[in-house]
Structures are given as structure tokens and as C-alpha cells.
Amino acid sequence: MISTSDFKNGTNILVDGEPYQIAWFQNHKPGKGGAVMRVKLRHLKKGGIIERTFKSGEKFKALTITRQKKRFLYKESNNFNFMDMDTYEQITVHPELLGKMVNFLKENLEVEAIYLENELIGIDLPVIIEMTIAEAEHGIKGDSVSNTTKTAKLETGADIHVPLFIKEGDRIKVDTRTGEYVERA
């Protein structure tokens, strides 16, 4: 059990039967009554943030989060298959758990699987990954006044905006958090 006096940013706790991570907290002592702890909590499975106030000294169950290195192997129908880097055990992940990350999953990409009490709750991609341009529109030469990007398709099928000089077959670096072009590889 963990008390409100032990709160730290990043601490994982169970609140009303749901797993949360403390994103922010502040001890508040009003003029009347006992001290309270104001907290912003990030839901570990859904990702949303809520604000709650707890009485000082209230206790919560601490949760254990573990990370394991996995390698993306292949997509089979609607599921994505990963292999544990240590045990070579394979797991199947549904696309709902991955969200927009599916746009950046290519074969043999190393990722981190996030487990909450032995239940897979998410996958973390590397922040910057190298991808190949599969298709690219032709840019209009001399068009530097208006929008200086064009749409290109990555090897995974995802669309991305790239500078005009990028052409089919080029290797680029992509930020997986924003889905934006970073630089040539």
C-alpha cells in the first residue's frame, strides 16, 4: 500500500479499481479542515487524464509496470505478431491496442511491450525510426512561396508530408510520436 505522502510523478496506483499513473500532484492545506492532495492521474489502459482530490494519508495499492523488449515479426489478417527477444515466445496484439502506431510497424522493428501486473497494456515504439519512401508525388519546381511539402507513402502504407526534394526509394527518419518527417537517413 502507498500513502498520499509517498506520491511521486510516475507512481502507478489503483484508484476505484482502475490503473492510473500520477502525472502531477500538489499538497493543499485549506484554512479549515484537514490537508488534501490534489492529483492528476493518467489512465494506464485508456490514456485519458482525470483530476482527483484525496484526503491526506489515504492509502492505495501500488501497481507494478514492467517493460520487455519485443521484435515485430509480421501482420496476420488483423493482428500483429511480436517475438520476445529473450525467450523467443510469440504474442499476438490486436490493432486497438496499437492505435496509430500500426503506421510505423515494419518487420524486425524492436519495440518495448508494457505490462501491468502481467497484462499487456501497450507497446512503445522507438521515437525516431528509419523508413523507405514507397511512393512520392512530384513536387512543382520553384514552388517555394506556398506549402513546401508533398505527400508521400511509406513502406508500411502510411501517408506522410515530406519536403519537395524527397523521392521514391529515399530513406528518411520519422518521429513516431507525431508522424512527421525529421530528416533524410
Swiss-Prot record:
InterPro entries: Elong-fact-P_C, NA-bd_OB-fold, Rib_uL2_dom2, Transl_elong_fac_P/YeiP, Transl_elong_KOW-like, Transl_elong_P/YeiP_cen, Transl_elong_P/YeiP_CS, Transl_elongation_fac_P. Pathway: Protein biosynthesis; polypeptide chain elongation. The keyword Cytoplasm applies. Keywords: Cytoplasm, Elongation factor, Protein biosynthesis. Its main location: cytoplasm. GO terms for molecular function: translation elongation factor activity. CDD domains: S1_EF-P_repeat_1, S1_EF-P_repeat_2. GO terms for cellular component: cytoplasm. Involved in peptide bond synthesis. Stimulates efficient translation and peptide-bond synthesis on native or reconstituted 70S ribosomes in vitro. Probably functions indirectly by altering the affinity of the ribosome for aminoacyl-tRNA, thus increasing their reactivity as acceptors for peptidyl transferase. This is Elongation factor P.
